[in-house]
Curated annotation (Swiss-Prot):
Gene source species: Hydrogenovibrio crunogenus (strain DSM 25203 / XCL-2)
InterPro entries, sorted: Class_I_gatase-like, GATASE, GMP_synth_C, GMP_synth_GATase, GMP_synthase, GMPS_ATP_PPase_dom, NAD/GMP_synthase, Rossmann-like_a/b/a_fold
Protein name per UniProt: GMP synthase [glutamine-hydrolyzing]
Residue stretches spanning the membrane: none
Active site: C87 (nucleophile), H182, E184
Gene name as annotated: guaA
Ribosomal protein keyword on record: no
Length: 526
C-alpha cells in the first residue's frame, strides 16, 4: 500500500493544552484512522496543507473568557470539513461563532449523567440507558469550570446535565459539534462510539491505519529513503529500539548493523537474550560491546543520582562512538523516536521550532560522524509500537515488558554502584519477576522491580547471626505513569518472594515492600 493511501484519510487535532489530547489521538488511531496533534496556534497554511477530513479542538486548562485566551484559527470553520469541539474546544467554538461562555457557579469534575437531545447525527442511538420518560442518558466524564450560556446562531441543543444546560450543541448543516464532556476517557462509556461516529460517519474516513498497512508503508518509505546505504542502530534491548531493529531488518536486511552496549547494569541474562533474539534467531548483524568494567570504573565513588545518570550517559556515548567509528560505510543512524517525543517537543508559538528532543539511545553524536537520521517509528504511539513488534515476530513477553530506565540498575542501586551490588540486585529482581509471572500477576501490574538499599540489617540464618544487605520490592498500577498506586499484591505472594530472595541470595537478610503512591513518591527510587 502506498504512503499516500495510508495517510490520506486523516484527522487534525488542535491542542489547547489538555492532559487528554494524546488520548484523543490514540482513540482515533485505534479506530484505524491516521491523525496528528498540532498546537492550537499552528500556521493557517499548515492547516490547509494538512488536508484533514475533520478537525477536533481539544480541551485545555485556560478560560475562554480570560485575556489572551487561546482560540482556533478562524479558517478552521471555513474549510468545509466537520469540526468537533471537546470541553474548552466547545467553548471556544461557541465564543468564536457568536455564542456566549460564562464562568459556571457549579463546576463539574468527574462522573456525570448527560441527557441527549434532538437525535443529532453525532449522538443518535448512542446511549447508556433510557429514563422512564424515554430520554437517552449517557454516563460521561466532566472537567470544566466555564460553560456555554448561549449557543451560536444555527446551533441546536444536543445534550444537557442538571448543572450544565448546554452540555452539547450541534450545527448539523455545517457539521460543527461541541460537547462539554470528554469522550476520549474510559469513564465516558460510549466515548469511543462517539469518536468513531464523528471520524468515520461524519468525516467519511476509511480505516486504513492498520498494523499491517503501517508495516508495509514503513518498509516502502525506509527503502525509498535509504536506498542501498548502510544503517547503524544503537540496540538497547528496550521496546522501541527492538522494534526498529526488527522493522529495519525486514526492510533492508544486511544493510543494518546494530551496536549493543552491555554496560553490566541490565536485567538477569538480558544481554544474552538480546543476542539470542536478534543475532541468532533473526540473523541481524549485532556487535556486542562488553563494557561492564568500563562503566563500573566510571561510576566508582559516585552516589548522586543525577551525576550517576550523566556518567552512564557519557560512558554509553563513548563506547558507541568507538564502535561506530570502525564502521566506515555507514550513512544513516536509526533511532527509536516515537510520536509522543515529537508532540512534546513542539510547543505553541513560544517554541514552534519543532526541534525533536534528543531522545537519542546514543545520547549526543560526534559532529564528524555526519550521519543522516532515520526515525521509522516517529508517527507511532507506544501501544502502536508494541502491536508492530508482535506483528514483526518479536515475542509478546519482550514487547510488553515493563519499562526499564535507560541507566538500568544504575538508578535502582541507591548510592554508589558496584559490581557486587548489581549482581545481588539482578538475582533478587529476577526472583520477583519470575514469581509475578508464575502467579499471573505480571500483566496486572504496570511496573515491578527490586531496589538495592545501601544499608545492612541483622538477620539469623540457622543459628548464626548475619549482617547483610536489604532490598525493597516495588510494584505499581497506573494508566499513564503520571500518577500511580502501589500494587496491592497478596501477602502470601509477598511472603513467598521474600523467602526465596533471602534463602537463595546469601548476601540479603531483609526484604521490604514499598507502599508509596505517586505522588508524592516517584515510581523509581532515583
Amino acid at each position: 500500500m502506498s504512503q499516500n493511501n495510508i495517510h490520506e484519510h486523516r484527522i487534525l487535532i488542535l491542542d489547547f493544552g489538555s492532559q487528554y489530547t494524546q488520548l484523543i489521538a490514540r482513540r482515533i488511531r485505534e479506530i484505524g484512522v491516521y491523525c496528528e496533534v498540532e498546537p492550537w496556534d499552528i500556521d493557517v497554511e499548515d492547516i490547509v496543507k494538512f488536508g484533514a477530513r475533520g478537525i477536533i479542538l481539544s480541551g485545555g486548562p485556560e478560560t475562554v473568557t480570560g485575556d489572551n485566551a487561546p482560540v482556533a484559527p478562524v479558517e478552521v470553520f471555513e474549510l468545509g470539513v466537520p469540526v468537533l469541539g471537546i470541553c474548552y474546544g466547545m467553548q471556544t467554538m461557541a465564543e468564536q461563532l457568536g455564542g456566549k461562555v460564562i464562568n459556571a457557579t457549579e463546576h463539574e469534575y468527574g462522573y456525570a449523567q448527560v441527557r441527549a437531545h434532538g437525535h443529532t447525527k453525532l449522538l443518535n442511538d448512542i446511549e447508556d440507558h433510557v429514563t422512564p420518560e424515554g430520554y437517552g442518558m449517557l454516563d460521561v466524564w466532566m472537567s470544566h469550570g466555564d460553560r456555554v450560556d448561549k449557543m451560536p446562531e444555527g446551533f441546536k441543543l444536543m445534550a444537557s446535565t442538571g448543572n450544565c444546560p448546554i452540555a452539547g450543541m450541534a450545527n448539523e448543516e455545517k457539521d460543527f459539534y461541541g460537547i462539554q464532556f470528554h469522550p476520549e476517557v474510559t469513564h465516558t462509556t460510549q466515548g469511543q462510539r462517539m469518536i468513531e461516529r464523528f471520524v468515520v460517519d461524519l468525516c467519511g474516513c476509511e480505516k486504513l491505519w492498520t498494523t499491517e498497512n503501517i508495516i508495509d508503508d514503513s518498509i516502502a518509505r525506509i527503502r525509498q529513503q535509504v536506498g542501498s546505504d548502510e544503517v547503524l542502530l544503537g540496540l538497547s534491548g528496550g521496546v522501541d529500539s527492538s522494534v526498529v531493529a526488527a522493522l529495519l531488518h525486514k526492510a533492508i536486511g544486511d544493510q543494518l548493523t546494530c551496536v549493543f552496549v552491555d554496560h553490566g547494569l541490565l536485567r538477569h541474562q538480558e544481554g544474552d537474550q538480546v543476542m539470542s533474539m536478534f543475532a541468532e534467531n533473526m540473523g541481524i548483524k549485532v556487535i556486542r560491546v562488553d563494557a561492564e568494567d568500563y562503566f563500573m570504573n566510571a561510576l566508582a565513588g559516585e552516589a548522586d543520582p543525577e551525576k550517576k545518570r550523566k556518567i552512564i550517559g557519557h560512558a554509553f556515548i563513548e563506547m558507541f562512538d568507538q564502535e561506530s567509528a570502525k564502521l566506515t560505510g555507514v550513512k544513516w543512524l536509526a533511532q527509536g523516536t516515537i510520536y509522543p517525543d515529537v508532540i512534546e517537543s513542539a510547543g505553541s508559538k513560544t517554541g514552534k521550532a519543532k526541534v525533536i528532543k534528543s531522545h537519542h539511545n546514543v545520547g549526543g553524536l560526534p559532529e564528524d560522524m555526519k550521519l543522516e537520521l532515520l526515525e521509522p517509528l516517529r508517527e507511532l504511539f507506544k501501544d502502536e509500537v508494541r502491536r508492530l513488534g508482535v506483528a514483526l515476530g518479536l515475542p509478546s513477553d519482550m514487547v510488553y515488558r515493563h519499562p526499564f530506565p535507560g541507566p538500568g540498575l544504575g538508578v535502582r542501586i541507591l548510592g554508589e554502584v558496584k559490581k557486587e551490588y548489581a549482581d545481588i540486585l539482578r538475582l533478587a529482581d529476577h526472583i520477583f519477576i519470575e514469581e509475578l509471572r508464575a502467579a499471573d500477576l505480571y500483566d496486572k501490574t504496570s511496573q515491578a522491580f527490586t531496589v538495592f538499599l545501601p544499608v545492612k540489617s541483622v538477620g539469623v540464618v540457622g543459628d548464626a547471626r548475619r549482617y547483610d544487605y536489604v532490598v525493597s520490592l516495588r510494584a505499581v498500577e497506573t494508566i499513564d505513569f503520571m500518577t500511580a498506586r502501589w500494587a496491592h499484591l497478596p501477602y502470601d505472594f509477598l511472603e513467598k518472594v521474600s523467602n526465596r530472595i533471602i534463602n537463595e541470595i546469601p548476601r540479603i537478610t531483609r526484604v521490604t515492600y514499598d507502599i508509596s503512591s505517586k505522588p508524592p513518591a516517584t515510581i523509581e527510587w532515583e
